[in-house]
Amino acid sequence: RDTEASRGLGDVYKRQRSAVMKKVEAIIRPFKLEDVKLALVNAGIVGMTVSEVRGFGRQKGQVERYRGSEFTVEFLQKLKIEVVIDDSRVDTVVNSIAEAAKTGEIGDGKIFISPVDTVVRIRTGDRDGAAL
């Protein structure tokens, strides 16, 4: 049944399926934070979130020594950087992060890109592009 309400829901659904914003999440080595931050600022990024995280991938932890004893650290310290950007800026941001974070060694990290349906700035109520 074609009602105004059902058309409105369809519009919301269409907008969600064709999100024009993306969330870029990068897991990097902690000592690369300043390099990545500078690269993002130079790429025009004005805001980011940084979180301390722990994990492992192919690196599978590492052996450490403490007072003569060896033990395995299964989860390695990493940082997660998150930015939400207009879809048109994804390649620039991803390339900036990858270049700045790369050492060429196992454990350099990963970059994940996800669609973002809606952004709301809490203080003003601005939405989507205006909230970025």
Residue ranges of model-derived segments:
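Positively charged, small/polar-rich N-terminal and surface patches that mediate targeting and assembly
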Residues: R17-L132
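Single conserved hydrophobic/aromatic residue that forms the stacking wall/gate
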Residues: R1-Q16
